[in-house]
């Protein structure tokens, strides 16, 4: 009788390791599900592989893209967005995500002329671009539920003035914070860039630069 009791007790003492592995497995599965859920619905990290958004974003900058805002409100002019390639881009064999700045909202009329961008007849005050655009474009009217996007490095960006508009369903989220490199950590603010404002014409001089037809991938 005593021997049986001892053996049964020994078996009970051996069971916790099995429970430990089971709990560890549950924890890992839960963590993976949470990570996938956060990346799909809340936020994700992206890096910048090209110069098309300079000087705002530099090559190898690391950003957080939040995905909640556009579930609650419409995108706004001046916001930096990440989006999946449009049908026009897929037809040109682009399959990675792009990052650009929203310039034209649904219903806007946009044109680029003599180094300036005009939205609904008003010239944008763009203090964030690398150099004034050295091309002419438009006027075009942005269709419903679509957006016109341009790179801040206007003369070195493969954007809407080449391939058209971005449907809203292609938008993945809004770039709102840079977390690398450390000296440049901070929020990507766009309060001063959102609205088209009338300003005095300025004389821009900039040599034309061939566009860099490389998408902003992961």
Curated annotation (Swiss-Prot):
Mode of membrane association: Single-pass type II membrane protein
Pfam families named in the record: Peptidase_S26
Cellular component, GO annotation: plasma membrane
Active site, per annotation: 52, 100
Keywords: Cell membrane, Hydrolase, Membrane, Protease, Transmembrane, Transmembrane helix
Superkingdom assignment: Bacteria
GO MF term set: serine-type endopeptidase activity
Periplasmic side of membrane: 44-218
Catalytic activity, reaction form: Cleavage of hydrophobic, N-terminal signal or leader sequences from secreted and periplasmic proteins
Record-level GO BP terms: signal peptide processing
Ranges in the topological domain labelled Cytoplasmic: 1-26
NCBIfam families, sorted: sigpep_I_bact (TIGR02227)
Protein name in UniProt: Probable signal peptidase I-2
